[in-house]
Every structure is written in C-alpha cells, then in structure tokens.
C-alpha cells in the first residue's frame, strides 16, 4: 500500500529566557523534544553554554568581542550529529538561533538496556542487542506499535497478518526458535512482562478459525508508540537467559517516557495523518461472461461463457412471468427477472472492486504534559487513534491514557510508578477461504454480474421471501443459501466486533542501602478484558445460513514481582565487579467464555435473541488456565583493565507446568582491542557469548486430568455417560510427569568495529 503522511508538531514552552547582548535558542531532536546538556560554542572562542533540561541555552557575548560580526555557532550532543549555523551578532540586544539535531545512529548504540531494565555500555557486552529510539519509530508513520519496529533492527522480522486496521503482527527475532510453541518474543514494558498473544477463542472458531474467520489483534498494539522512550531488542540467548522459559524467542525491552525535572511545565500536541491505498489490484478477466463452453449460463460458478464483446448489446431478454428479485424503492428500485438471453455488454469488475475497497485513513492525536523538579517528575499523555481500513466498514479506534510519576522521598529512597490504560474497539471483515468471507465471493464473481442490490425480496408464485441474499450464484435470491457471500453482504450485514479494556502498571522502589549498594523492588500488573461479537444474519452462506450470533469474553491477568540487589565492588583501578541477585514471582491467569445461538426463526438484524427462538438451543463452553513461575537469578559482571569484560549469569526456575526445577546458564565476554589496531579503525571488539533459554510446556501437561462428555463405544451401540446423568473420569490423554521444557542452546561470536572516528560501523 502507498502511504501519504502529513505530520504537525506544535510544542508549547513556558518560561522562556529573555537576555540582552546574547544569543539564545533551543536545541531539540527532529521530533521537537528538548536535548538537555548540548554544548553550544562560538567557533574559535571559549564562549559558550550548555542547554538546560528544556533544551534552552543562552550565551552572553563579552563586551568588545564579536558584536556586529557574523560568527559560527557549533552545537554538539552525544548520540546526535554535530551542527553549525552562521549568526549575526547585534551591537546590542539578543538574537535567537534554534537547532534541530539529527540522530547519529552509531553514537546512540553506546548505551543499551539489559534484560532486567538496567542501562549498560554496549561496548562492554559480549551479547547481541539492538536499540531503537522513539524518533525512528514515530517517523515510520505506522499506526500500530508492532509495525513501527519493521526495518529498525537486523534479524527482526515483522509481518502484518492482514490489511485489516489493527490486525495482528508477527514479530520474529532470528527466525523460528521453537517446534512446539509460539515464535513471538517476550515483551517487557518498564520491567513488567506483558501479554502479546493473538487469541482466537471459541467464537472465532465458530466463524472459521485462523484461515476462515476474522483476524485478531496483537496485544503489543495496545501500546501507544508515542509514549515510548526507547526499545531494546535482546537477540541472543545469553542476553535473555535471565527470563528463563519465556525467552527462547528473544526479548523486547520497552521503556516509556519520564517527566522533566526542570521545574517548568511542558505541553506538546502532535497530529499525524496517513492515507492507505491499494498498490496493485489482482488482474481479473472481463472477456468471457458467466457460463461454460462458450455459452452463457446464469448462476453457475464458472466464467467461461460467451465472449462479452460479441453480444448484440442492449437489454437482456427476460421472462417477467417467472420468479423475480426486487430491492430498493423509488429511484433506487431494482428488479431482476429470469434471464432468457444475455445481450448486455456491460462488465462490472472495477465497479464491484470499488464497492468493497476504499482509500483507508488514520488520524492520531497525541497530547502530553510533563514537568517536575529535583524531587519529583510527572508525565501525563492522551493518545486518540481513529483508523478506517481499505475495506469499507472496517475500522480500529484506540484511546490511550498514561500517567508516569517519580518521587525522590529521600537521599536513599526513590519511588517510580508508570501506568497506561487502553480502550480499543474494532470491526474486522471475514476473510480467507470462507464461504461467508470477503475475497472468495468477490474474486469468483463473474465479470458481467453487478454485485450491487445484494439484499431484497424474492417473489415466486405471489409469495414474497424478504431479506434474501443475492449473489452471482443465486442471482434471483431464489434459495436461502447463496452458496458464496456477495462481498457487499459480507461488509455491510455481517459483524465481527471487539472491544478491549487494558491496564498495564509497574511500580518500582529503589533503596540505596549504602554507597555502591542498591535494592530494587518491582511490582506490576497487566490485565485486559476482550469482548467479541460475531453476527451472521439469516441468509449468510454456508453453515451460517440460518443465522449465527456468537460471543467471546476473554480475560487475561498477569502479576509480576521482582526483588533485586545490586552491589558494586572496586578492587583496584584495573579490576571492578558488579554483583546482582534477584528473585521473581509471576502469576498468569486466562479465561474464556464462549456462547453461541443459531437457527433464528425470524430474519432480524438485531444482535439480541432469545435462546428459545431457535431450532437449536444456545451452546456454551469455557476454558481456564492458571500458570505460576518463580525464578532466582544472578549476574556477575567483571571489568578488568577496562578492556576485558566478563558477564556470568543464570536463572533457576520453578514452573507450575513442569514437575521440577530447571537452570538456564549464560555467559558472555568482550575484549576491546582498540589500542592495538591502526587507523582508520577507531574501535574494535571481539565478543563471545553462550546461553540457554527455554519454552515451557502447555499448562497441566504433566498431570492426568478429568474429562466429561465421553462415550465408551463409538459403534452402533454407543454407551454415553450423558445417558446416566453425567460424570467424570481420568482423561485418556495421560499426563507426562517427566515432561521437560524445550531448551535452546546458543553460541555466538563476532567482531564489532568502527572506523573513521565512529562514522562507519
């Protein structure tokens, strides 16, 4: 799809500085965010200043130096490209010169984030990771968080599952990593592991499952990309091993934005608009009409009839005495009689296509307020996304609220709280190889059949059959089942809606026990409820011909607790060590309740029915899963001679789906050889890493559970437990008490280098 993007960023600053005989201005990044600590210097002199936390700088010009002259201002900031500008210095008064710096991709890579959320120097690590800054994500113009990661890091494959707005996205790091489980990486937001599943549930199975139903959403897309400060992709097993059986597919560590400690309030408003268009249309033939063997035949599935160009033209010959189809009123009225001879040369390939597809559009508004001082900071944001898909009547709406606070209670205690609430709702279209889906009916429609007037009344022998579904297979609506849906019925009459309420919250207390020793306590929760409705009115194709209404209520809740101790030891100028010891407790609960009713007696568009009005009663099922895990983990980081860096780590994990504990070790070593290489090399590092990570078995696989609704015979004399009042027995699928996690062992080594003063890497 082609995308046209238009962004408007309006920063509003308070407390701007006024100065005389000076140069003043702001230093920001390309998104308009302030850069604190940037150095601004008058070229060739020692006169300069540093920008404050709001990006403001002010240089007082010494009397009798450069007044009335044109000078060059040089600005530099770590991680950004240096910039210069010519400025005319007035004889008196002030002049303003603002700078917008571009990201220096190589410079930013110096800082990375570890699996536990602590910052580290990438040049001192032997494991592999990639950093993605918020500016790169926002410039992608994508409406979904997952899609904005595409092309931002090597060996990270991002594939949207469909063109529906809000549709799920597959993220794979270094390809497939497991034969038994999902290949999605673990997502950690502000120290809290969150759910990123794409759940299809019972209702979607009713509508055809993954290949024939409607697509669902990746839960990572509940996050507003504009709230993110940085993303770290941990690719290797050695970098991710501390997460144990969750980390076989890598880890994506997300950090959201913090408030400002400048003492001033900052308000920012940003609006982004995007337009989506079909890039290329599937070529469809319009030479031959409906029929076979060179002859027109109405209502059959083939389009190898007569040549349309060789018809006589004009109106078709019809029989008005036979059954017919009628729809609309007044100027919009339409009547289709039984066709006796096909004369019309009209084709409708493009009209049928345009009736289904449109130019998609999304608009996102983001409002942010931040501020604080040396003892407290705050950030509040609101994001509003409205997206209409390229398929008519498909949409995705999302509202995000975020409140991040940080309080320094004393010299020893700091409290941080970050909370994000999301509400989203969407309507998605039935897809794939599905008789009630969109494309199978659209692509098989004969070129000389007009899909408009898809719903009306079939009249036969003076009897009216209202609400009939007209398609190219049943052009009079003569039967209740149209064989394949008319695509306009699919997008206008059927519904597949979802509404999600989600809360992600993490709290952290950092206690400085003494110089060099910190204790960090974290507690977080990720919980959501997903309410889904599927509605197929009477006359939908296939097994839904008598009408189906299905509902899913899916809830997921995860709580996570960490207690971490870190101690820094310095034995000499050439040898130091950081020891980290932690304990993690994690609970995950999932439940799904699915209900269905079908075979309506009355053809109605209302999505509420009485269970007694159907030929069959409503059916219901539910599923519940509870998983608990605990991990004890440790990291020992050794720095020798400021050239050799060794990290040893391990995690001992107990899991409710496994009967015994498992240990996941890891190590990495980095040796800097910069002092031993000639120009033009400015940096050289040899690295080696080894690690193990796992994939846990599904819940309860090591147990033999009870089952109900079983039969003891499948022959002509079945003995069913339901005939005897119900009951339970041990499942005939026996549990395996010796089941083990799937373990991935990974070894990697390589050379990292930079050249020409870090301009090339």
Specify the residue positions occupied by each region the protein language model found.
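Short, polar/charged loop or turn motifs at beta-strand boundaries
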Residues: 27-30, 128-151, 159-163, 171-178, ...
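Short, acidic, small-residue-rich periplasmic hinge/interaction motif at the N-terminus
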Residues: 28-33, 38-43, 72-81, 90-138, ...
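N-terminal periplasmic "start-of-domain" segments of outer-membrane beta-barrel proteins
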Residues: 43, 47-56, 112-140, 166-170, ...
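Periplasmic N-terminal soluble interaction domains immediately after the signal peptide in Gram-negative
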Residues: 46-47, 52-110, 244-246, 256-258
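Extracytoplasmic beta-strand/coil segments of soluble accessory domains associated
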Residues: 60, 146-202, 229-230, 240-259
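Outer-membrane beta-barrel proteins
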Residues: 135, 199-201, 207-208, 215-258, ...
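Residues embedded in well-ordered regular secondary structure
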Residues: 152, 164-169, 179-185, 194-220, ...
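Extracellular/periplasmic, surface-exposed regions of secreted and cell-surface proteins
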Residues: 184, 398, 404-413, 418-423, ...
């Amino acid at each position: 799809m082609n995308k046209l993007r238009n962004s408007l960023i309006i920063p509003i600053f308070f407390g701007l500085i006024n100065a005389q005989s000076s140069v003043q201005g702001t230093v920001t990044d390309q998104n308009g965010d302030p850069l604190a600590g940037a150095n601004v210097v008058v070229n060739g002199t020692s006169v300069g200043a540093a920008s404050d936390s709001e990006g403001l700088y002010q240089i007082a010009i010494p009397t009798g130096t450069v007044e009335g002259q044109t000078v060059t201002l040089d600005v530099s900031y770590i991680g950004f490209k240096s910039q210069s500008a010519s400025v005319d210095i007035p004889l008196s008064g002030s002049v303003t010169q603002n700078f917008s710096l571009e990201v220096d991709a190589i410079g930013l890579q110096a800082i990375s984030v570890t699996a536990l959320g602590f910052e580290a120097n990438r040049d001192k690590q032997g494991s592999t990771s990639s950093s993605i800054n918020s500016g790169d994500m926002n410039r992608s113009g994508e409406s979904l968080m997952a899609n904005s990661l595409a092309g931002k890091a090597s060996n990270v494959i991002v594939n949207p599952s469909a063109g529906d707005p809000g549709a799920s996205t597959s993220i794979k790091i270094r390809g497939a990593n497991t034969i038994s489980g999902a290949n999605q990486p673990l997502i950690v937001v502000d120290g809290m592991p969150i759910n990123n599943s794409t759940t299809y549930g019972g209702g979607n199975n009713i509508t055809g499952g993954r290949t024939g139903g409607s697509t669902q959403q990746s839960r990572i897309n509940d996050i507003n990309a504009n709230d993110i400060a940085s993303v770290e992709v941990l690719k290797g097993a050695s970098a991710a091993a501390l997460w144990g059986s969750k980390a076989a597919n890598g880890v994506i560590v997300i950090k959201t934005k913090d408030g400002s400690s400048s003492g001033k309030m900052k308000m920012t408003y940003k609006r982004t608009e995007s337009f989506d268009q079909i890039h290329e249309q599937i070529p469809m033939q319009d030479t031959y009409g409906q029929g076979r063997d060179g002859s027109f035949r109405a209502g059959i599935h083939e389009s190898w009839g007569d040549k349309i160009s060789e018809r006589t033209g004009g109106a078709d010959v019809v029989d008005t005495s036979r059954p017919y189809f009628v729809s609309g009123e007044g100027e919009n009225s339409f009547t289709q009689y039984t066709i006796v001879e096909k004369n019309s040369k009209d084709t409708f390939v493009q009209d049928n296509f345009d009736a289904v597809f449109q130019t998609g559009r999304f608009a996102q508004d983001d409002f942010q307020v931040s501020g604080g001082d040396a003892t407290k900071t705050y950030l509040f944001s609101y994001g509003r996304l409205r997206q209409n898909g390229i398929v008519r009547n498909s949409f995705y709406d999302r509202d995000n609220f975020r409140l991040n606070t940080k309080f320094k209670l004393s010299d020893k205690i700091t409290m941080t709280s970050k909370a994000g609430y999301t509400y989203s709702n969407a309507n998605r279209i039935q897809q794939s190889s599905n008789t009630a889906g969109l494309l199978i009916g659209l692509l098989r429609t004969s070129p000389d059949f007009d899909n408009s007037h898809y719903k009306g009344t079939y009249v036969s022998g003076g009897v009216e059959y209202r609400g009939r579904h007209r398609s190219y297979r049943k052009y009079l609506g003569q039967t209740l089942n149209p064989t394949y849906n008319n695509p306009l019925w699919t997008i206008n009459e059927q519904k597949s809606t979802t509404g999600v309420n989600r809360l992600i919250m993490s709290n952290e207390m950092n206690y400085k026990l003494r110089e060099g020793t910190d204790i960090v306590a974290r507690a977080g929760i990720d919980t959501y409820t997903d309410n889904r409705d599927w509605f197929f009115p009477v006359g939908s194709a296939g097994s839904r011909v008598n009408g189906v209404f299905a509902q899913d209520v899916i809830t997921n809740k995860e709580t996570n607790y960490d207690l971490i101790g870190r101690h820094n030891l310095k034995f000499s100028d050439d040898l130091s060590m950081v020891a980290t010891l932690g304990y993690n407790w994690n609970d995950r609960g999932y439940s799904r309740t699915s209900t269905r009713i079908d075979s309506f007696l009355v053809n109605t568009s209302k999505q509420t029915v009485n269970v007694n009005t159907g030929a069959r009663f409503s059916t219901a099922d539910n599923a519940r899963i509870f998983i608990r895990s605990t991990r004890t983990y440790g990291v020992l980081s050794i720095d020798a001679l400021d050239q050799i860096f060794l990290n040893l780590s391990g995690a001992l994990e107990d899991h409710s789906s496994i009967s015994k504990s498992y240990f996941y070790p890891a190590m990495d070593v980095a040796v800097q050889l910069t002092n031993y290489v000639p120009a033009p090399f400015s940096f050289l590092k040899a690295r080696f890493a080894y690690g193990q990570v796992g994939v846990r078995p599904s819940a309860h696989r090591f147990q033999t559970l009870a089952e109900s609704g079983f039969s003891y015979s499948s022959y002509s004399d079945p003995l069913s437990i339901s005939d005897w009042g119900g009951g339970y027995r041990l499942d005939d699928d026996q549990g395996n008490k010796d089941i083990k996690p799937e373990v991935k062992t990974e070894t990697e080594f390589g050379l990292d280098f930079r050249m020409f003063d870090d301009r090339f890497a």
